Amino acid sequence: MGRVAIVTGGSRGIGEAISLELQKMGMKVAANYAGNDEKAREFTARTGIPTYKWDVGDFEACQEGVRKVESDLGPVDVLVNNAGITRDGTLTKMDRKGWQEVIDVNLGGCFNMAKAVFDSMRSRGYGRIVNIGSINGQGGQYGQVNYAAAKSGIHGFTKALAQEGARFGITVNALAPGYIDTDMVAAVPEPVLEKIVAKIPVGRLGKATEIARGVGFLCAEDAGFVTGSTLSINGGQHMY
């Protein structure tokens, strides 16, 4: 029987590529989503991957969502915290709601989901948790104090939880994508996009499948000695 995996935000963009990669690895994948029901149904019809709707920023919804997945597929072995939102704006223009929504989903969602699966993983002596960070959590980004703070927090969360899980066979890692050719990036005005690409040493945007391959590595059975790490996939744009 294949491992059971949950991918939050798993039916679109980078999340879709991750769901498909884990499916290709033989896992039973549950793709979480929070928005468009029609697109979620289309995703399931096209891929055979079931979708489950809940808001990862809601603690109780995460508990209930995981219970539903486990009832359908079995205990969760792999968790990929990919769901994220943006509410961009400079600090001067940002209101508290725009700050809190991003923190609750992007960082709080990692806590909520890990809390829902960690004890079960620990009791079974196996788990893979991958938290999707961002290049903007590593280097910051103008107009994204909320997003950068949340994504930066993911890296600290990852390192701390990795220490808690290590002796129970649970690895916890982060993956920090650079600028990836998704619908979100495609919406950036062309002049701005040109400036972004000019700062990427490889000279192009990344592909969602390239991020998915990195996640697949971190979720693999034989990746048990990799924990507390951040894998940066950004075309060389940010090195440290």
For every predicted segment, state its role.
Residues S11-R12:
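Conserved glycine-rich cofactor-binding loop
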Residues M25-R41:
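Conserved glycine-rich Rossmann-like NAD(P)H-binding loop of the short-chain dehydrogenase/reductase
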Residues T90-L91, G98-I103, V185, I196:
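Substrate-binding pocket helix/loop in short-chain dehydrogenase/reductase
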Residues A114, A150, T158:
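Active-site helix of classical SDR
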Residues D119, Q163-E164, G224:
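Alpha-helical segment proximal to the catalytic Tyr-Lys
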Residues S134:
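Residue(s) in the substrate-gating loop at a strand-loop-helix junction
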Residues A166, T171, V226-G228, N234:
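Short, small/polar-rich loop/turn modules that mediate ligand/substrate recognition or access, typified
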